Amino acid sequence: VTYKAGDTTIFIPGYEMSLAERASKKYQVLVPSLYNYALFPTLKKFFDPLRPDMTYENGSRDYFVHRLADTYLMLAEAQFKLGKQTESVAAINAVRVRAAAKGKEDAMKVTSVDMNLIMEERARELAGEQTRWMDLKRWNNLVERVKLYNTDAAVGVRDIHYVRPIPQKQVDLSENGGFPQNSGY
């Protein structure tokens, strides 16, 4: 099969289709039962409708540096740690109501907050935004959470993963070993 720019090559319907229905298409159909670590739908928030093809790197979407939802979640955590449950709940609900489907705002609200809810809310709201490792490191539960929620990585995760290796070139350029490699690397 020969494709040209603009042709559909992979279709991700978001629902199951029969094998016969998938086979009738001249492109790959990726249904939920086929999702794996290599094939899965991208996060919609990163979708760039103006990008003409996968080789075009200059997308039209801005990079997320910081979002208001992140600020509310930081506020919720700070208020929780200060024992201000009401204020923490209000900050979490500001994020949840904004993300709710129309007419479902009240169903999304929480009435109490604990640290586990804050950790999970940050994981959901900030998925794919490159903040998770820093959060887990800051909370000192990186190894615990990886073992609990990522069975593929659980085997190899260790305490050294709280830090990253420093590029060897940087270590080599430092005067008198003033920039040593992080322990374990």
Please state what every model-predicted region is.
Residues 1-67:
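Flexible, polar/acidic helix-loop-strand segments at domain edges
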Residues 34, 41, 55-65, 96, ...:
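Long, intrinsically disordered, low-complexity segments
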